[in-house]
Amino acid sequence: MSYPKARIRRFFRQHCQRSLESSALDLVYLDYCLFLQSLLKEANIEAAKTGERRVQPEHVRSIQRKILAQFKG
């Protein structure tokens, strides 16, 4: 499965003055995927604690600071 390399490259061009190598773009994308996976896993646990079957926005909001702190660079 491929990922949107052009979109990531465009994002970095808009927000940074430097270009990135292809391997750096790969690492950024993998870190992003790991972040989303962790966020959804913790939100799912939070939903189970409250007895919900689906993950609601409030479950994500309640754990977002914890996950963001883990991924702070």
From Swiss-Prot:
Record's protein name: Inner kinetochore subunit wip1
Broad class of where this protein is predominantly found: nucleus
Quaternary structure and interacting proteins, as annotated: Component of the inner kinetochore constitutive centromere-associated network (CCAN) (also known as central kinetochore Sim4 complex in fission yeast), which is composed of at least cnl2, cnp3, cnp20, fta1, fta2, fta3, fta4, fta6, fta7, mal2, mhf1, mhf2, mis6, mis15, mis17, sim4 and wip1.
Role this protein plays: Component of the kinetochore, a multiprotein complex that assembles on centromeric DNA and attaches chromosomes to spindle microtubules, mediating chromosome segregation and sister chromatid segregation during meiosis and mitosis. Component of the inner kinetochore constitutive centromere-associated network (CCAN), which serves as a structural platform for outer kinetochore assembly.
GO BP term, pick one: mitotic sister chromatid segregation
InterPro entries: CBFA_NFYB_domain (IPR003958), CENP-W/WIP1 (IPR052484), Histone-fold (IPR009072)
Lineage: Eukaryota, Fungi, Dikarya, Ascomycota, Taphrinomycotina
Keyword Nucleus assigned: yes
